[in-house]
């Protein structure tokens, strides 16, 4: 019964906490909009030269551009956003481990609130601007919208689960910046943020579409465009990464106990 109230409260807390940084979010929305316009013109030129590249037409490509720009904040595609490394270094993680919920579930609930806030404040403006300037396609019915909503939620969970593992690494590495940098490169390149993974050739394309990063952007955008669903793929990677995160949490707890925390 406690969990029924606890986790919705934590989601609301995560939303409100990030709402205090409204100007930062609006600045991010402005930046995403500007880069979205620049990317759109590049993609228009590319698709005019190579029509139907990767199974997309020009409108699909421009829609891909602005919807992926809207995903940057909610999916936290440049990494971070959890605050766990700082708490591990300060020792405050010991307090987190005695809360009435697991560290992983607690942090996930807060992150869902963060994602919801950034979707509204940082995600909608570039999408609306793209629709106004270029004209974007959209899901063709309530069923497709519902599938996209579910896929988007699963993408946020996969993103969280990956970033959670990166954050836990500081318990053994002391400084997670190297891992975080590698993670940012992988998320940017293999999620589908830079370019649709459908245009990657041969074995590189097969590899990119099989990695968890594809579940963060490429699968949701394909659902949005009606190019497929991929929900089972997202569920699989969410389950795998969350299981690894749960195992990592147990190792962190053991390490804190051994060190007298």
Q: What role is predicted for each listed range?
A:
Residues 1-261:
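Hydrophobic transmembrane alpha-helices and immediately adjacent juxtamembrane helices
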């Amino acid at each position: 019964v406690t969990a029924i109230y606890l986790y919705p409260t934590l989601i609301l807390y995560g939303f409100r906490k990030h709402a205090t940084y409204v100007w930062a979010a609006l600045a991010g929305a402005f930046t995403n909009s500007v880069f979205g316009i620049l990317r759109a013109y590049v993609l228009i030129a590319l698709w005019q030269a190579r029509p139907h590249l990767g199974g997309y037409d020009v409108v699909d490509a421009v829609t891909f551009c602005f919807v992926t720009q809207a995903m940057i904040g909610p999916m936290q595609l440049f990494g971070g956003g959890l605050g766990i490394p700082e708490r591990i270094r300060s020792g405050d993680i010991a307090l987190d481990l005695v809360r009435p919920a697991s560290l992983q579930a607690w942090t996930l609930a807060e992150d869902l609130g963060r994602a919801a806030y950034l979707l509204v404040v940082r995600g909608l403006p570039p999408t609306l601007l793209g629709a106004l300037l270029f004209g974007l396609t959209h899901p063709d019915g309530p069923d497709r919208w519902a599938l996209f909503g579910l896929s988007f939620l699963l993408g946020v969970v996969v993103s969280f689960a990956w970033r959670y593992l990166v954050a836990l690494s500081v318990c053994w590495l002391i400084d997670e910046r190297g891992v975080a940098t590698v993670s940012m490169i992988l998320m940017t390149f293999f999620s589908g943020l830079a370019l649709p993974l459908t245009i990657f050739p041969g074995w590189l394309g097969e590899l990119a579409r099989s990695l968890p990063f594809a579940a963060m952007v490429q699968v949701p955008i394909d659902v949005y465009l009606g190019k497929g669903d991929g929900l089972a793929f997202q569920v699989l990677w969410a389950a795998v990464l969350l299981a690894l995160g749960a195992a990592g949490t147990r190792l962190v707890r053991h390490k804190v106990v051994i060190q007298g925390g």
